Amino acid sequence: MNINTASLINFTQSLVRIPSFSIQEKAVVERVIEEMHSLGFDRAWIDEYGSAVGVIEGARSGPTLLLDGHCDTVGAIPADWSHDPFGAEIVGDMMYGRGTADMKGNLAAMIYAAASVDRARLAGRVAVSATVNEELMEGPTLKAIMDVLHPDGVVIGEATRLNLNRGGRGRAEVVIETRGRSAHSSSPQAGLCAIHEMIKVIQAVEGLEVQVDPLLGPGFMVLTDIISDPYPGHSVIANRCRATYDRRLLVGETLQTVLEKIDSCAGLEGVDFSTSVLYGEEKTYTGADLKMSKFYPAWKFAEEHPFVQSALRGLRSAGLSGACARTLCKGCATPAAGPSSPRIKHLGAAAALGVLDKA
């Protein structure tokens, strides 16, 4: 496998220099397609949701391997950065910029790796997808590509320090709503403040036991926002209050078990509250609709799984440690491996050039 490292670095810089916040990925997707054509992919196209897909065909029939990386990023406030988030500046062996680690550097490495495959020796095909909207809604744009390609295995290029992740915690956006009784603030005894009721629920949730998976870690809940109604209050006691939690899921947890655990909290017998999972509705930059419950189950594969073992052998043959750890997809073998560290995916994101080349 011969990779032109200078071209890989230049391509990564070009991706980082194109802002591609969720729902604004059109320009970066077009840049990906341009590079796929330049590198000799047999087919490259943009699907209905706006994701880029490229395919390398082998000389003989065989399984399909899909390499996936999302091309959207979270936002960036330049004042919070020590380097221009869209400058792709190289200092020493590090490239700085939004998306270098999560996950434009990883995506670029996968595109170049696929392009370098010896077609004469390849039985099957290698595909690469640059999916959109992942930061807002995980999964549906990747699933759409899988429904077309029917891959036998998927590798997702998340930041793993080049280890192989064989499992991942799931995630749910849990909404809790409390109900009270409105009254003017001059007569508080006539009302029941939904905010005070929410405080009781929050305290009960904080007291819930956190389950721990030996591979995936803890299945915790984090409060991410809270708002009362009416807002602003204007001297009116709130009759409703809504809080959103980010709940990290472990294998075997379902929507029902997650909500029942909150509903059955001790000490909330007199509190009028309800729980639900947020239903997401988004439009991609092409105008296509994405709709789904924001409940993404956890998953993990045994270390002995044939695809996991095959991936480990590949890492080790490339001179990497091939350590097996945790991290996304349902229905087929889906390990993850990529350059950089999970800790630097967002604020001050950077990627080591040497690690990018190894990826």
State each model region's role.
Residues 14, 112-119, 200-206:
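Short glycine/serine- and small hydrophobic-enriched flexible loop segments
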Residues 68-70, 129-131, 155-158, 177-179, ...:
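Short beta-strand segments
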Residues 1-76, 240-244, 258:
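N-terminal helical capping/dimerization or prosegment-like subdomains
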